[in-house]
Amino acid sequence: MGDSQSDEPEGDIAVQTAPPELKRPPLYAVVLLNDDYTPMDFVIEILQQYFALNLDQATQVMLTVHYEGKGVAGVYPRDIAETKANQVNNYARSQGHPLLCQIEPKD
């Protein structure tokens, strides 16, 4: 049989697929904004409860908010940052405080 076809490939060609390039998600800072009515102790409570800061860390962030007008409570991917900001805003309202929390893109 002169024209038989073989199941074996003619050349050894190796195709190597590149692993997908995974990028880290963009990060957002959860920022507390100063106001003239929310007690400092309440801000510290928020920072401990929602951002797992110890008393010293929470106090430092609270003082930054108080003296500079805003302070970063934590940095997270967008979904988590939005959730934390919403939780803080809802809790502050439920306790009768005007504290505002927002997210900002992290540089």
UniProtKB/Swiss-Prot annotation:
GO terms for biological process: protein catabolic process; proteolysis. Involved in the modulation of the specificity of the ClpAP-mediated ATP-dependent protein degradation. Binds to the N-terminal domain of the chaperone ClpA. Belongs to the ClpS family. NCBIfam families: PRK00033.1-5 (NF000672). This is ATP-dependent Clp protease adapter protein ClpS. It comes from Acinetobacter baylyi (strain ATCC 33305 / BD413 / ADP1). The lineage of its organism: Bacteria, Pseudomonadati, Pseudomonadota, Gammaproteobacteria, Moraxellales. The gene is clpS.
